[in-house]
Amino acid sequence: MFDIGVNLTSTQFAKDRDQVVKRAKDAGITGLLITGTNALESQQAQSLATRRPGYCWSTAGVHPHHASEWSGETAATLKRLAESPEVVAIGECGLDFNRNISEPEQQVYAFNAQLELAAELAMPVFLHCRDAHDRFLAVLTPWLPTLPGAVVHCFTGTREELEACLAAGLSIGITGWVCDERRGVELRELMPLIPADRLLLETDAPYLLPRDMRPRPPSRRNEPCFLPHIVQVVAGLRGEEPEALGRQCDANARKLFRLPA
């Protein structure tokens, strides 16, 4: 079981980060990908991964919420970070028109710039898309022939959107959203449609604690050690054995991010 989306730089983990990683290992998690969401957090993510070689890796990128911060200096920082062996993908990048914390055109500009960087460096991309599917694919599609791979992190879209992403050759990241009996109803129905070699699993910790976890942790904070719960739910929806699904998703992550087996 490999967790491809952990916000380990979050201040929610400031007091017990080492224990969080230990609990993940004890729970059978085979590796963690630490998400970078702006220049500073990408540097922090790389630093955290460096201190945990062979178990943690990181991404370097600018989340659409931070797109207004994009600059030449940002691009230079990400490029420098991407030279580190611990940094295995560009992102989290993409479009988020749900809240438009950054203006849509700022988001498109930063997204294009990061896709260009990923193409230049021949690195996979770690993608974010919310309420922006058509524009997202319109921006992304021309770059796909130049990219070695891409995953849509925390996919929560419709069947039509899933089919479009799969047709474009994208991998699909599934979080504990699928465990939500209210918001995750449609997503649950889509689980059997994702090809086995395109499915990746993630907690997005400390966010998106699975709603159906019992007992719920007193802190209500999500952790990578809860990934087995997501694996179990997804396996049930796909009619598969959890152990086999965990191994498959681990192999998928290592192939996409070019990590040792």
From Swiss-Prot:
Location within or outside the cell: Cytoplasm
CC annotations in GO: cytoplasm
GO molecular function, one term: single-stranded DNA 3'-5' DNA exonuclease activity
Positions bound to a divalent metal cation: E92, H128, H153
Assigned keywords, A-Z: Cytoplasm, Exonuclease, Hydrolase, Magnesium, Metal-binding, Nuclease
InterPro entries reported in the protein's UniProt record: DNase_TatD-rel_CS (IPR018228), Exonuc_TatD (IPR024918), Metal_Hydrolase (IPR032466), TatD-like (IPR001130), TatD-type_Hydrolase (IPR050891)
SUPFAM superfamilies: Metallo-dependent hydrolases (SSF51556)
EC code: 3.1.11.-, 3.1.13.-
Statement: the UniProt record of this protein carries the keyword Transmembrane helix: no
The protein's required cofactors: Mg(2+)
Function according to Swiss-Prot or TrEMBL: 3'-5' exonuclease that prefers single-stranded DNA and RNA. May play a role in the H(2)O(2)-induced DNA damage repair.
Quaternary structure (record): Monomer.
Assigned protein family: Belongs to the metallo-dependent hydrolases superfamily. TatD-type hydrolase family. TatD subfamily.
Record HAMAP family: TatD_exonuclease (MF_00901)
Protein name: 3'-5' ssDNA/RNA exonuclease TatD
Organism encoding this protein: Erwinia billingiae (strain Eb661)
Gene: tatD
